[in-house]
């Protein structure tokens, strides 16, 4: 089994796969990445370089390829799938989910899922026209980017030029001179966001309890499960998540692939109670780290089992915490330049119902997510406070 991307999420999936007897090689753009520290072997390469990726496939001859990042030469994934390798969840799904245009067309125009009003643009003039149609304020994003890169909120026509420039500079790796298409969509009256982890396996498709979240500049900072919402919101969220994943899996199966794995379906809940589709991550989701404290099987264990063809039923995705309680996660982001040394860990974990996962990334340059605090509490506020206290109690030195 070959991992493309060896971050903290891949590390947890690698551990779960090895518990089930899988042999794992973890690849990334640098040595010492979290999953590389626990895998049987590792490789370092530019995964967006088709020649390097093809050479890696020829060397390893993987039975299963697990993309854990988006900056990958997807043409080589498709070629590997054509040669008989199992790409997780599929080469076709990976290509769709990294392209906002293809994903939005599938979700809204083919599957009929509700979304914000949107337009696509391949030039500054088209962006101006699209923004006029969807109205201000609006959001402009590159077709291909992640973690909020290249995204901006535009409140008037005067800011459109700057938004176009931001999108071009923040898009995924590209050749100099290329122009990236963008999506411009109406800024919805958002109440909150949800993630619905949805699992496709040999037994079909099941959904986990929705996860609440807090973000900063497009990056996950906190999550909690189960989130609090009305029965109507739950029904809408589960329907949208299941329909989106069913549509993606159908695309995979049409190309002869399996489509098995965990999907993080991102949803907007509006102030009027309506739920909109936003995006899908075809792999375990950042916000799903809370499942290490909340579920019988974490999103990582579910992903590993689904990949290997084991059946996942609703019983496998059940919460493991006492009824009425809530689990929370709190990302620990470190700023500086050098190696991070964690101190005061014993005091930070003194409160019952708390835990910590240190990712052991080699260095920090600027700011980087280096660990996550976990907690179980009597309600959402209690769980979030306990996880936050763990994060605040740590003494993290840059050495």
UniProtKB/Swiss-Prot annotation:
GO terms for cellular component: cytosol. Belongs to the PurK/PurT family. Mg(2+) binds at residues 266, 279. This is Formate-dependent phosphoribosylglycinamide formyltransferase. The keyword Hydrolase does not apply. GO terms for biological process: 'de novo' IMP biosynthetic process. Its EC number is 6.3.1.21. InterPro entries: ATP-grasp, ATP-grasp_carboxylate-amine, ATP_grasp_subdomain_1, PreATP-grasp_dom_sf, PurT, PurT/PurK_preATP-grasp, PurT_C, Rudment_hybrid_motif. It comes from the Bacteria. The keyword Metal-binding applies. Homodimer. Pfam families: ATP-grasp, PurT_C, RS_preATP-grasp-like. It is an enzyme of class 6 (ligase). The gene is purT. Gene3D superfamilies: 3.40.50.20, ATP-grasp fold, A domain, ATP-grasp fold, B domain. Residues 105-308 form the ATP-grasp domain. It catalyses: N(1)-(5-phospho-beta-D-ribosyl)glycinamide + formate + ATP = N(2)-formyl-N(1)-(5-phospho-beta-D-ribosyl)glycinamide + ADP + phosphate + H(+). The lineage of its organism: Bacteria, Bacillati, Actinomycetota, Actinomycetes, Bifidobacteriales. One of its GO terms (molecular function) is phosphoribosylglycinamide formyltransferase activity. Involved in the de novo purine biosynthesis. Catalyzes the transfer of formate to 5-phospho-ribosyl-glycinamide (GAR), producing 5-phospho-ribosyl-N-formylglycinamide (FGAR). Formate is provided by PurU via hydrolysis of 10-formyl-tetrahydrofolate. ATP binds at residues 100, 141, 146-151, 185-188, 193.
């Amino acid at each position: 089994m070959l991992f493309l991307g060896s971050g903290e999420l891949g590390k947890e999936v690698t551990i779960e796969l090895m518990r089930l007897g899988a042999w794992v090689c973890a690849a990334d753009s640098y040595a010492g990445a979290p999953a590389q520290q626990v895998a049987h072997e590792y490789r370092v390469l530019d995964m967006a370089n088709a020649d390097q990726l093809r050479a890696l496939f020829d060397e390893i001859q993987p039975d299963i390829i697990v993309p854990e990042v988006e900056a990958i030469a997807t043409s080589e994934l498709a070629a590997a799938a054509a040669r008989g390798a199992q790409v997780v969840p599929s080469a076709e799904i990976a290509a769709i989910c990294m392209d906002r245009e293809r994903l939005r067309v599938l979700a809204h125009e083919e599957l009929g899922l509700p979304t914000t009003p949107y337009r696509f643009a391949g030039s500054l003039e088209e962006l101006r026209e699209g923004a006029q149609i969807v109205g201000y304020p609006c959001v402009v994003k590159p077709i291909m980017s992640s973690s909020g890169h290249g995204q901006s909120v535009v409140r008037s026509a005067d800011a459109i030029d700057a938004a176009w420039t931001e999108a071009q500079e923040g898009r995924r790796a590209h050749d100099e001179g290329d122009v990236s298409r963008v999506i411009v969509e109406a800024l919805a009256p958002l109440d909150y966001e949800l993630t619905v982890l949805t699992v496709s396996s040999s037994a079909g498709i099941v959904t986990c309890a929705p996860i609440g979240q807090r973000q900063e500049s497009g990056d996950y900072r906190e999550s909690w499960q189960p989130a609090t919402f009305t029965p109507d919101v739950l029904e809408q969220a589960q329907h949208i998540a299941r329909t989106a994943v069913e549509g993606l899996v159908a695309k995979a199966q049409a190309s002869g692939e399996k489509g098995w794995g965990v999907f993080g379906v991102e949803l907007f809940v509006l102030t009027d109670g309506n739920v909109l589709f936003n995006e899908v991550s075809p792999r375990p989701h950042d916000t799903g780290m809370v499942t290490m404290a909340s579920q019988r099987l974490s999103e990582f264990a579910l992903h590993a089992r689904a990949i290997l063809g084991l059946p996942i039923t609703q019983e496998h995705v059940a919460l493991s915490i006492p009824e009425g309680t809530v689990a929370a996660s709190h990302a620990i982001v470190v700023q500086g330049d050098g190696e991070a040394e964690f101190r005061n860990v014993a005091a930070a974990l003194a409160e019952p119902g708390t835990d910590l996962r240190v990712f052991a990334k080699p260095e920090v340059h600027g700011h980087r997510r280096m660990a996550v605090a976990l907690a179980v509490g009597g309600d959402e506020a209690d769980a979030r406070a306990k996880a936050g206290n763990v994060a605040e109690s740590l003494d993290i030195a840059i050495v």
